[in-house]
Structures are given as C-alpha cells and as structure tokens.
A protein has these predicted regions:
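Membrane-embedded alpha-helical bundles of multi-pass transporters/translocases
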Residues: 2-500
C-alpha cells in the first residue's frame, strides 16, 4: 500500500501528468474558495431576511437581482480572458494570486451591521455585492479554467477534476459548520446573532479567500499563447461549436427550478428539537449533522468517480443515475417522514441513510460536468483552432449564479405563499424562523424533501440528449497531438511553460 503522505506530496510530474503536491495545493485552493462561496450563497438570504429584518419579497429581489448581475458578468469576464494577450503558462495563473485578499475583505463587509435603516442596508449590500462580484468572477473563471489546461490528456484531466471536486466539497462542508458555530457563539453570550454572522463572514469569507491563493501553485500544461488580441465577438462565437457545454448549461438551468427554501427554514422552524439516541439536539446542530453525515458516503465516493465512470460507460451515465436516484429516494423519504414523523429519531436516521445513498452519485455530478466540458474544449480547438477555457468555465459559473438567482427569486415568493411572518411575536434577539405557525409549518416537510425533485426531472429530460463517446474523444486527442507537434514540438512547449512558471 502506498504511503499516503508521500503520495499526496509527491513532486513527480511530466508533460502530461500533474504532480500530486501541486494537485493538492489546487484542491485546497478550491476548498478555500468554496468556503467563501458557500457561506455567501447559503447565509446572505437568511441574514438579510431573518436577522436584519428585511421583508421576504425584498430579500428575494435583492439576492436574485444581485446574482443575476453576477451571472451576466461571468461570460463577459470569460470572453475578455480568452481574447486578451498572454504568454505561455500565464493565461490564468496570475489572477489566482492577486485578487483573493480584496474579495475576502468585501465579503466580510456584506455581513456587517452598519446600523442603517432598511433602504440604506439594501443599497449598501447591493453596492458591495456588485463590487465583489467583478473580482470574484475573474478569480473564479481562472480557478476552474485551470482544469482543462492541467493536462492535454482526458484521463488525467478526469483525475484532476476528481480531486478539485473533493477540495471544493470539503470547503463547502467546512462552511456548513456555521449554524453550529453560530449557536455556540450566541448561547455562550460571546456575541449577538448579527455579530455571529460577521464573525462567520470573516472566518469563512475572508479566510477562505486567503486559503484559495494556494491554487497559484498549479501549472498550465497545455501549450497555448496569444500574441495578438482576439476579437471579443469571435471568441464568444465559438460557443456555437460546443454542443456539450450548451446541453449541460440548459440542464443545470432547468434543474435550478426547485420549490425549496434554505435549510434554516426547515431545521429551525417552530423551535424544533430532535431526539436522537437519548440526546436532544437543536435545529442548528441537526442541520449540520444532516449535511455532514449523509454527505460522508458521497464524499468518499468522489475518490473513485473516474473509475466508476469508466466502469459504467462514461460521465453521462453518472449524471443520469444521479437524477433518477434523487427522484426515487426523495419520494420514498417524503412518505417516510410525512405527518411530522421526521421528528422521530429512528425515522430521521432511516431518512438520513436514504439520503446518504442518494448523495453517492450526486457528489460525482460536478466531476462529470467539468470532465465533459474539459473534453469539449479540446473538440472546439480541433474545429476552430481556439482554446476557450475562459468562456467555457465562465458559462458554468454563469449558469451556477443564474440558477442561484432563480432559486432566490422563487424562495422569496415561496415564503410569501407560505405566509412567513418576520414580525411574528418572539423573545428579544431571536430570529422569527422558530416562531412561525399555520401554512408555513404545514408545508415545511413538503418543500424540504420534495421541492428539489422538480428540478431533477427537468434536468434529466435535457441531459439525455448529451453525447459521450470515448472512442471519439481518443481520436480528438490524437489529432490535437499531431497538430500541436506540427506547430511546436511538445518538449519545447513544455520547457517554455516550465520556464514561465
């Protein structure tokens, strides 16, 4: 058995193989970035609505409009990155070093209570969000765009995709600890709820961005350079040659149409406490456990995603299996926990076991998306002579943020439909989630367990049209290798990249 320490810190590399120590730094960098992203995406809506007291529909508009701007900004940034002049090995790496500290500071400011009224708070949050978005978009496109540049070979890129997905998932899980940390801070009297959110933003937002700087150690191993600026419109027009990217983007966009709320609105509703193995757990603690424990099998399975995909016949089948599994398992879990049976410890554990099984292929989805898109960039290069890391991965970011925006928009009106009252009578200093009645409580389990099924059905319909032919991809690699060798010998190209790095 290999020594895991030697394996992770191995510096062995070639023109096609990524050194494990660089891959580890890249994965940790993605973990840091996802700490920031997940804290903001999961907590900003709740912070503005339940903590700062902004009305649900206004909160929905703030977060959805801000995220829409964020989404539209990404393709512009990606196109500009692809069309600019750069030297070999320096297309994306510089952005990974200089932008994170600024992004981290701006993130923390979004969660600071300046003591302003509702209108002033809305203006401040939107203004800061728009500023942070520009810098975040550049860094985000550069981080993920490094994946197709990591190696000219599909199998090695799949390995890189697998490890960075593990890093990203780890970062999201770390950020998911916030509810428990928040409860501990508040219950110990160390800070108010507002200040607890600011502490979270400082730790996960700013701290995560500092950690993300480690990704700068990754190298660009696919020889590419632009001695002259390309037309922005020409760069953007290459998207029409990328059928894989278009199908994945459409599937993800439709998959974001879910009738569900952030987890806090379920786990903290009506001051619920959960009785498990004789222990009484708070809603915040149960939320962390529900995210952490069922996520363990899926996190472990990510280490074998590439092998699993090869065994079943490709990454497309991973995507299909993940959605069918989610539809079936969520439906079974809904009936198992209906009529408030989810409050029973034994029932809840059974549901968590089902969700654990569901999460195994679900956690492989992002690996499959990125692996397929990295391969599609090679296909576009063969057709057009242009490499499109910037625009291709900015489109993925665009869709991520567009789906987030549509989700936030739906959440605002779903709260209104459920008659959520953020002025409900409650003890001083307590957020209103735990004191709701009526329709909100009646449908809390429906929205939590069945809401995501709507998006899964829509996603599955579209993804069935995706092509994933391994023999065709091998031929693309062969032709590209001949093309690159004709333009510049691979050894010489690699030496240039090494020197520039």
């Amino acid at each position: 058995m290999k020594n895991p320490i030697k394996f992770l810190f191995s510096s062995e590399e070639s023109d096609t193989k990524v050194a494990n120590n660089r891959l580890l730094s890249y994965a940790i960098g993605l973990a840091g970035q996802n700490m920031n992203y997940n804290f903001v995406s999961q907590r900003l809506f709740v912070f503005l609505n339940a903590v700062m007291g902004i009305k649900p529909e206004k909160t929905g508009w703030i977060t959805s409009v801000s995220t829409l701007w964020d989404a539209v900004n990404d393709p512009i940034i990606g196109t500009l990155i692809d069309s600019r002049k750069f030297k070999p090995g320096r297309k994306l790496r510089p952005f990974l070093l200089y932008l994170p500290p600024l992004i981290g500071v701006l993130t923390a400011l979004m969660f600071f209570d300046f003591g302003m009224n509702e209108t002033q708070t809305i203006v401040m949050v939107v203004a800061v969000y728009l500023m942070v978005d520009i810098f975040y978009s550049v860094q985000d496109v550069a981080l993920w765009g490094m994946l197709p540049l990591s190696s000219p070979h599909s199998e090695e890129r799949a390995r890189v995709s697998q490890w960075v997905a593990i890093g990203a998932g780890a970062g999201a899980s770390i950020a998911g600890l916030f509810p428990t940390i928040k409860d501990m801070i508040i219950n110990s009297g160390l800070a108010t709820e507002k200040n607890a959110y600011f502490i979270g933003a400082a730790v996960f937002g700013f701290g995560g961005m500092i950690i993300s700087m480690l990704a700068y150690r990754m190298k660009e191993k696919v020889y590419t350079q632009a001695e002259e600026r390309e037309s922005v419109l020409k760069t953007l027009s290459t998207l029409r040659y990328n059928k894989t990217l278009i199908i994945i983007c459409l599937a993800r966009l439709l998959g974001g149409i879910t009738l569900t709320l952030p987890w806090e609105y379920f786990f903290e509703s009506q001051g619920i406490s959960y009785h498990v193995f004789g222990l009484e757990l708070t809603g915040g603690t149960m939320q962390v456990l529900y995210g952490l424990i069922p996520g363990i099998p899926g996190a472990f399975a990510m280490f074998f995603a590439a092998k699993f995909a090869n065994r079943i016949g490709g990454m497309k089948k991973v995507l299909v299996i993940s959605e069918i599994g989610q539809i079936l398992i969520r439906t079974v879990a809904f009936f198992l926990g209906s009529n408030d049976r989810f409050l029973n410890g034994g029932i809840l554990i059974s549901i968590m076991v089902l969700i654990s099984i569901m999460n195994i292929p679900i956690n492989m989805k992002d690996i499959a998306h990125r692996s397929l898109i990295s391969d599609s960039i090679d296909e576009v290069e063969l057709k057009t002579g242009e490499r499109t890391e910037g625009i291709s991965f900015s489109m993925q970011n665009f869709i991520s943020k567009l789906t987030s925006a549509e989700s936030k928009f739906i959440q605002g009106y779903l709260l209104k439909f459920l008659k959520f009252d953020n002025n409900v009578k409650r003890p001083a200093g307590k957020n209103p989630i735990g004191y709701q009645t009526g329709r909100f409580l009646k449908y809390r389990w429906h929205q939590f367990m069945l809401g995501p099924v709507v998006g899964s059905i829509l996603y599955l319909i579209v993804i069935l049209f995706l092509d994933d032919d391994r023999e065709h991809m091998a031929e693309v690699e062969r032709q590209l290798k001949l093309k690159r060798e004709a333009e510049q010998p691979q050894e010489e190209a690699f030496e240039m990249i090494e020197a520039e790095s």
